């Protein structure tokens, strides 16, 4: 299947399997600047010609005064070009010399002049190196992004070769047709799929790119994705309805293509995750009524995996309490395994983004089930035994009242944390508004992955973060909690905190109730059993079901208290969990820019990365224990108590928390916020340093606002009841 490679289609232009575009010229091959001070090193002037006399070299280094002198001498002007048609604007563009480009344009440079071996424009030279600030400058002054080079590639195609999503977003907002083709009928989507850039594929598909478009040989984007074998690209194309049986002009389907190119593993995996068998046909569950239940897969799987744990928890408790310990424990484990196996079978037919338990409401259902069966046990067993059924003078009405109160609070705040909008940052109303935001960020030199979300197409406020589970940016994002199946953000953070407090107090009060309950019911119980001490034997023999339930709910106290402790410390420090783990973003680290405009910060990788994690600044590594540690909140707890957090220890001296106003003020801001406790707050509203702020529209840190004295859209302000931040 060697002919499948895109290089073979364009044999006159490319060689091998890279299918990379021809470089702008032999000189351009050496242009790999990382900073503005690095210049194109090809064909430097010889001894007979000084740097000041070589207009091309002056353009490379961006020496505007020297260029002015050359123009004043009358030897050159901005329209000068060499024998290959290359102009000073070409060299300034490929080396990201923004000031030089602006100077040349203002002095009459031909902005769409073609030159070099590939006969390309300055815009294409700049796009080849992902210099999107220079690209934007050229576009503002009339550069045509649809002009093609010698190979038939326009600026969108050339930009796709490098996979820089920010540059592609900029170009798409210029009105370039997303399905524009090159000489051989390849769309940008095909190139992104072939190069293995899942983020670019996702961007083009969300922009409306056709998954059914074919090139001259009948290849679709899905065929090209199978050449590279990128699972992310293949999966995304199938999700958007790519034809799994489309044939090329030679009759080859994607399945045949995958087999001949040894990418069957990625192909079959993508098919499975999208609900198809290995032949590409819809997978049909063997259980009765499956076609009815799976009409709406997402709704059915979500509801099933929330309520099925109710059966799991009940079966575990009954199994373990119905037999001696050496039989009950294995029986309980077997029951849990069997019930989870059923859930796993349902999960096989879930949408592709719900194929793992931690991406579903499974853990939420386990907690809800524990809460439900605890309430049932209290109402049917413990309540009467510790009030009306207790010996005279040994009733515990007050303790029962306290438990009922904490139980009710836990239920309410649990539901509030789960159902309330966590603080999703509002999206733009259309492409025009998105373009206005992009233009504003470019004007402020803030167009980068730190300040712009390519998924939501919005300017990201400070302290916000894009949640890959919720697929939205969340204002003052704390963390995504699998136990409430929701993000914890500015809108529901306090509800989540009250949920933890109520849960902790509820478990403690119930344990006290159970102590008095067993003291009453176990007086005549046998002390004989296996393994356990006589006291525990009496409790289990008196009421084994309640005993197992007590052990189960008390175990929850471990992770709850760790999480509660961490949250108390973070509130006192005016930090979120994300900031505690990965550092504080205050909007001041984006002044130093690389040639692409990305921040000079190792914690913020370029969006040209090909992996799914390219848009966020850290990688999640580790096996099952690490995953369990994150799920139970152990990681932030350890980071907090050991002082190894991102804003503690060695990093403490590097950056002060601009959001902290002192422990007392921080706590007052959080706890005395006028937003309703029993109800939903206005989206993004909060208190910071005693002033009302809107975290869904905060773009500069308070410390920077204090220095500059600005109180506009780029920061925060105290507002009245009719004012909007």
Swiss-Prot record:
Pfam families: Ank_2, DHHC. GO terms for cellular component: early endosome membrane; Golgi membrane. Its EC number is 2.3.1.225. It is an enzyme of class 2 (transferase). SMART domains: ANK (SM00248). It comes from the Eukaryota. The chain crosses the membrane at residues 304-324, 327-347, 365-385, 398-418, 496-516, 548-568. ANK repeats lie at residues 84-113, 118-147, 151-180, 184-213, 217-246. It catalyses: L-cysteinyl-[protein] + hexadecanoyl-CoA = S-hexadecanoyl-L-cysteinyl-[protein] + CoA. Keywords: Acyltransferase, ANK repeat, Endosome, Golgi apparatus, Lipoprotein, Membrane, Palmitate, Repeat, Transferase, Transmembrane, Transmembrane helix. Residues 1-303, 348-364, 419-495, 569-725 are cytoplasmic. It is a multi-pass membrane protein. It is found in: Early endosome membrane; Golgi apparatus membrane. GO terms for molecular function: protein-cysteine S-palmitoyltransferase activity. Residues 451-501 form the DHHC domain. Residues 325-326, 386-397, 517-547 are lumenal. The active site is at residue 481. The DHHC domain is required for palmitoyltransferase activity. Palmitoyltransferase specific for casein kinase 1. Belongs to the DHHC palmitoyltransferase family. AKR/ZDHHC17 subfamily. This is Palmitoyltransferase AKR1. The gene is AKR1.
């Amino acid at each position: 299947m060697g002919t499948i490679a895109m290089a073979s289609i364009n044999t006159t232009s490319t060689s091998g399997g890279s299918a990379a575009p021809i470089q702008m010229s032999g000189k351009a091959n050496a242009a790999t600047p990382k900073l503005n001070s690095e210049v194109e090193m090809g064909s430097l002037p010889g001894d007979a010609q000084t740097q000041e006399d070589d207009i091309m070299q002056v353009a490379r280094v961006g020496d505007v005064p020297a260029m002015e002198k050359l123009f004043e001498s009358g030897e050159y002007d901005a329209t000068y070009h060499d024998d290959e048609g290359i102009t000073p604007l070409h060299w300034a563009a490929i080396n990201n010399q923004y000031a030089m480009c602006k100077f040349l344009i203002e002095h009459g440079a031909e902005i769409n002049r073609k030159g070099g071996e590939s006969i390309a424009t300055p815009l294409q030279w700049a796009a080849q190196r992902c210099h999107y600030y220079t690209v934007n400058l050229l576009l503002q002054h009339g550069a045509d992004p649809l002009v093609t080079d010698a190979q038939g590639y326009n600026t969108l195609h050339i930009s796709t070769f490098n996979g820089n999503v920010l540059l592609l977003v900029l170009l798409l907002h210029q009105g370039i047709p997303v399905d524009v083709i090159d000489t051989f009928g390849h769309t940008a989507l095909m190139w992104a799929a072939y190069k293995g850039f899942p983020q670019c594929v996702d961007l083009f598909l969300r922009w409306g790119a056709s998954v059914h478009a074919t090139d001259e040989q009948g290849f679709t984007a899905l065929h090209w994705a199978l050449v590279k074998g990128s699972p992310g690209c293949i999966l995304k194309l199938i999700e958007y309805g790519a034809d799994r049986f489309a044939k090329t002009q030679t009759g080859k389907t994607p399945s045949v293509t995958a087999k001949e190119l040894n990418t069957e593993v990625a192909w079959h995996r993508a098919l499975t995750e999208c609900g198809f068998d290995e032949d590409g046909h819809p997978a049909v569950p063997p259980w009765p009524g499956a076609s009815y239940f799976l009409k709406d897969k997402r709704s059915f799987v979500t509801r099933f995996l929330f309520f099925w744990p109710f059966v799991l928890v009940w079966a575990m408790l009954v199994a373990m309490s119905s037999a001696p310990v050496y039989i009950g424990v294995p029986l309980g484990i077997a029951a849990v395994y069997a019930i989870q196996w059923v859930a796993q079978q349902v999960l096989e037919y879930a949408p592709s983004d719900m194929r793992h338990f931690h991406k579903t409401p499974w853990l939420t259902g386990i907690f809800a089930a524990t809460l439900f069966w605890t309430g049932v046990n209290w109402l049917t067993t413990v309540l009467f035994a510790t009030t009306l059924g207790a010996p005279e003078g040994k009733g515990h009405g007050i303790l029962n009242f306290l438990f009922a109160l904490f139980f009710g609070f836990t239920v309410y705040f649990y539901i509030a944390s789960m159902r309330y909008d966590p603080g999703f940052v509002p999206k733009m109303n259309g492409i025009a508004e998105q373009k206005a935001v992009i233009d504003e960020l470019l004007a402020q030199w803030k167009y980068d992955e730190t300040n712009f979300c390519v998924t939501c197409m919005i300017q990201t406020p400070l302290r916000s973060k894009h949640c890959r589970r919720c697929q939205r940016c969340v204002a003052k994002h704390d963390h995504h909690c699998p136990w409430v199946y929701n993000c914890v953000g500015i809108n529901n953070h306090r509800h989540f905190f009250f949920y933890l407090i109520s849960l902790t107090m509820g478990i403690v009060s119930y344990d006290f109730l159970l102590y008095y309950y067993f003291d009453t019911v176990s007086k005549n119980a046998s002390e004989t059993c296996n393994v356990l001490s006589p006291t525990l034997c009496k409790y289990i023999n008196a009421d084994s079901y309640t005993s197992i339930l007590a052990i189960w709910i008390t175990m929850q106290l471990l992770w709850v208290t760790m999480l509660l402790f961490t949250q108390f410390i973070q509130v006192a420090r005016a930090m979120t969990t994300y900031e505690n783990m990965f550092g504080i973003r205050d909007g001041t680290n984006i002044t130093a820019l690389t040639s692409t405009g990305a921040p000079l910060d190792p914690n913020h990788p370029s969006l040209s990365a090909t992996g799914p994690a390219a848009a966020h600044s850290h990688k999640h590594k580790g096996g099952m224990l690490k995953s369990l540690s994150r799920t139970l909140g152990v990681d932030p707890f350890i980071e907090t108590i050991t002082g190894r957090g991102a804003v503690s220890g060695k990093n403490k001296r590097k950056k002060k928390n601009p959001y902290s106003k002192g422990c007392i003020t921080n706590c007052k801001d959080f706890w005395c916020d006028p937003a309703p406790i029993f109800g939903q707050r206005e989206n993004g509203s909060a208190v910071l340093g005693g002033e009302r702020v809107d975290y869904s529209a905060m773009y500069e840190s308070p410390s920077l606002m204090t220095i500059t004295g600005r109180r506009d859209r780029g920061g925060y302000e105290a507002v009245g009841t009719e004012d909007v931040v």
